[in-house]
């Protein structure tokens, strides 16, 4: 879904269209996906997505849909449209050669986030919250945490670690719709200035050194970090 959002933004910036709808949908109408993922040992046996937690034991499938309507900011303002947020920049890349779909490349992930920040023209330290991919797997979560830290936390104070969460702990992994659901959650965080808890985070994963990475996972609703400018969130997928 975020690939569609990225491509829509590119078309809008190039003047190829005046507005665009982008998103994704997942409907589980056959058991095939469950069978395949189960045979691969990828699904959580207890049906709970415990992203970045010690109890992370696999991902949880979910179904749903999400769509956003995109327009250039100047045109949306001129038309008097309600504006839920502004996409400052985005990027798209490929994982490259890895040992499998459940073992993503940390270097590629970090480069993607760095490129997105560069496209947005922002200092990564200005990001007050990141909505992570956070599938709840014991191997994938530490890889993503490392990548996000390398991309966003190099100049961040250890006393102010970056909050991150995963909507998959609420809804499961919506697969082709997962990215846009994370984007919508990020927009709601901006709108209300509140960061919700990431569920099922009873204890941090022993494979993630949160202090060293300068990251943290909120376990209760909290206010968005104070900023001297506009609120900014990042979405990784």
Q: What do these predicted regions represent?
A:
Residues 1-237:
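Condensing-enzyme catalytic core of the thiolase-fold
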């Amino acid at each position: 879904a975020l690939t569609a959002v990225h491509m829509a933004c590119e078309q809008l910036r190039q003047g190829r269209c005046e507005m665009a709808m982008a998103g994704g949908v997942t409907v589980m109408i056959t058991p095939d996906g469950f069978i395949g993922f189960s045979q691969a040992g990828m699904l959580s046996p207890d049906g709970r997505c415990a992203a970045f937690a010690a109890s992370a034991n696999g991902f949880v499938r979910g179904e749903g849909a999400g769509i956003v309507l995109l327009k250039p900011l100047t045109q949306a303002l001129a038309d008097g449209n309600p504006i839920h947020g502004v996409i400052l920049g985005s990027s798209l890349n490929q994982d490259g050669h890895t040992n499998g779909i459940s073992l993503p490349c940390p270097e590629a992930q970090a480069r993607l986030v760095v490129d997105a920040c560069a496209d947005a023209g922002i200092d990564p330290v200005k990001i007050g919250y990141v909505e992570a991919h956070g599938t709840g797997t014991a191997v994938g979560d530490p890889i993503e945490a490392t990548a996000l830290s390398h991309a966003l936390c190099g100049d961040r104070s250890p006393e102010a670690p970056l909050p991150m969460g995963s909507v998959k702990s609420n809804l499961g992994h919506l697969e082709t719709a997962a990215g846009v659901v994370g984007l919508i959650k990020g927009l709601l965080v901006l709108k209300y200035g509140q960061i919700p808890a990431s569920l099922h985070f009873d204890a941090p994963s022993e494979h993630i050194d949160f202090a060293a990475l300068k990251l943290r996972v909120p376990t209760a609703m909290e206010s968005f970090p104070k900023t001297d400018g506009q609120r900014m969130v990042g979405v990784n997928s």
